[in-house]
Amino acid sequence: MERFLENVMYASRWLLAPVYFGLSLALIALALKFFQEILHVLPNVFALAEADLILVLLSLVDMTLVGGLLVMVMFSGYENFVSQLDISAGKEKLNWLGKMDATSLKNKVAASIVAISSIHLLRVFMDAKNVPDNKLMWYVIIHLTFVLSAFVMGYLDRLTRHNH
């Protein structure tokens, strides 16, 4: 009975495979939105004010960072929790595949969230005259919470690795 339960539990990891595949569909949706934004801005690029163009560019950078985060979570999560990715010899392989454990993935996700939050906060500050002060305050508080969380996770990881 114990062996049966263990085998079922171990096989249940494959329930995550469609979730990771769903992230690839989310990446397609993000890419479509990215190019929609490019197609929207290009015809009007000469009519846009510099600040408005910078806001659009920050939005594109933000989407790019989110896309990188999706790829990192999708591949590393699949490799850590479902199965090793078997990339054919001779095909291009990302050099970090198979080298990122759950802890390093968590730290990279935290760093990515801080970067995404920084870009978002910069976009908000570029339009600060149209954002109420209390909303600005909450954006900063939330961003600082992300920064502090990432710092604490990195510090705890360093302590854990140092003690082992």
Swiss-Prot record:
The keyword Transmembrane helix applies. It is a multi-pass membrane protein. InterPro entries: UPF0114, UPF0114_bac. It is found in: Cell membrane. It comes from the Bacteria. GO terms for cellular component: plasma membrane. The chain crosses the membrane at residues 10-32, 53-75, 136-155. Keywords: Cell membrane, Membrane, Transmembrane, Transmembrane helix. Belongs to the UPF0114 family. PANTHER family: UPF0114 PROTEIN YQHA. This is UPF0114 protein YqhA. It comes from Salmonella typhimurium (strain LT2 / SGSC1412 / ATCC 700720).
